[in-house]
């Protein structure tokens, strides 16, 4: 059986959401596809290579197999992974492979998991591997759509976005950097988080592309203020602004991706994504 699950883009609220503020997050039309076939042994194939249940090479897939194995006896499986989502970019590649793996295992081994059960298991796998997790990524990958968190209220997001990928970065490092800044200047940083919170709430009900673009620019200025941008990102955003395009970091920052509203002309080095209404699904 083959299952696929979408990646995600944090539109507004990164970092602030860690401290109880709101975030707007959308599934995107880039998918991870996982094929599972019954076998007498375990074999995993992906862009990272071929292995058995090798945790070092395929931690999320191996842990998903182990968790699913607590529900159903699995003597072996051939698992093949193909993904359109750039790894380590902040676009939800890890959650997508977890969710798609669990859904494909469930279909191939005649499980009875619904989407809520798939999400709960995927969230647990994410915690197993990362130590802690908000659950936002596996939720988006499972259910699709655009949402306001933490309420999990569906929002309308009828826009396409350009995305520029600056390569992988350490989420933990960026989160720690912001935490240290907040320790030194708690009142200042909390006021910045409050402003980001207001942006997320306004963006969840935004009606026009013009207003959304303004919020993108304001949010990026606040992310720069808490130290999660870098000179390369700043230069690129400045170049885009000269072209009449606003852009902001999505995710942890320090690398990863930036995005902006797609107006018909694709900026150099970018790719185009759009919100994806459908979450995990069985392909065949």
Swiss-Prot record:
UniProt keywords, alphabetically: ATP-binding, Cytoplasm, Isoprene biosynthesis, Kinase, Lipid biosynthesis, Lipid metabolism, Magnesium, Nucleotide-binding, Transferase
EC number: 2.7.1.36
Binding site for ATP: 86-96
Pathway connected to this protein: Isoprenoid biosynthesis; isopentenyl diphosphate biosynthesis via mevalonate pathway; isopentenyl diphosphate from (R)-mevalonate: step 1/3
Subcellular location: Cytoplasm
Cofactor(s) needed for function: Mg(2+)
Disulfide topology: none
InterPro entries recorded: GHMP_kinase_C_dom, GHMP_kinase_C_sf, GHMP_kinase_N_dom, GHMP_knse_ATP-bd_CS, Mev_gal_kin, Mevalonate_kinase_arc, Ribosomal_Su5_D2-typ_SF, Ribsml_uS5_D2-typ_fold_subgr
Broadest EC class assigned to this enzyme: transferase
Major localisation: cytoplasm
A Pfam cross-reference name: GHMP_kinases_N
PROSITE patterns linked to this entry: GHMP_KINASES_ATP (PS00627)
Catalytic activity: (R)-mevalonate + ATP = (R)-5-phosphomevalonate + ADP + H(+)
Any one GO molecular function term: mevalonate kinase activity
Catalytic residues (UniProt): 137 (proton acceptor)
UniProt record similarity statement: Belongs to the GHMP kinase family. Mevalonate kinase subfamily.
General function of this protein: Catalyzes the phosphorylation of (R)-mevalonate (MVA) to (R)-mevalonate 5-phosphate (MVAP). Functions in the mevalonate (MVA) pathway leading to isopentenyl diphosphate (IPP), a key precursor for the biosynthesis of isoprenoid compounds such as archaeal membrane lipids.
Record text on subunit structure and interactions: Homodimer.
This protein's name: Mevalonate kinase
Gene: mvk
């Amino acid at each position: 059986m083959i299952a696929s699950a979408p990646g995600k883009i944090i539109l507004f609220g990164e970092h602030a959401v860690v401290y109880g503020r709101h975030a707007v997050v959308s599934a995107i039309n880039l998918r991870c596809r996982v094929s599972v076939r019954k076998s007498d042994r375990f074999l995993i194939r992906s862009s990272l290579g071929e292995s058995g249940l090798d945790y070092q090479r395929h931690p999320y897939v191996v842990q998903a197999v182990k968790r699913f194995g607590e529900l159903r006896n699995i003597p072996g499986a051939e698992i093949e992974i193909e993904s359109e989502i750039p790894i380590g970019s902040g676009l939800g590649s890890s959650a997508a492979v977890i969710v798609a793996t669990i859904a494909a295992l469930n279909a191939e081994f005649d499980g009875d998991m619904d989407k809520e059960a798939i999400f709960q298991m995927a969230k647990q796998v994410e915690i197993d591997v990362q130590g802690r997790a908000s659950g936002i990524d596996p939720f988006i990958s499972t259910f699709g759509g655009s949402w306001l968190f933490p309420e999990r209220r569906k929002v309308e997001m009828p826009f396409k976005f350009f995305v520029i990928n600056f390569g992988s970065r350490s989420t933990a490092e960026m989160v720690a950097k912001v935490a240290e800044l907040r320790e030194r200047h708690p009142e200042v940083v909390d006021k910045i988080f409050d402003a980001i919170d207001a942006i997320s709430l306004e963006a969840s009900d935004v009606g026009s592309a013009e207003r959304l673009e303004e919020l993108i620019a304001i949010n990026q200025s606040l992310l720069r203020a808490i130290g999660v941008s870098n000179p390369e990102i700043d230069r690129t955003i400045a170049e885009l602004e000269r072209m009449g395009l606003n852009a902001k970091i999505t995710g942890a920052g320090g690398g990863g991706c930036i995005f902006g509203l797609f107006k018909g002309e694709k900026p150099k080095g970018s790719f185009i994504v759009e919100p994806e209404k459908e979450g995990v699904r069985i392909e065949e």
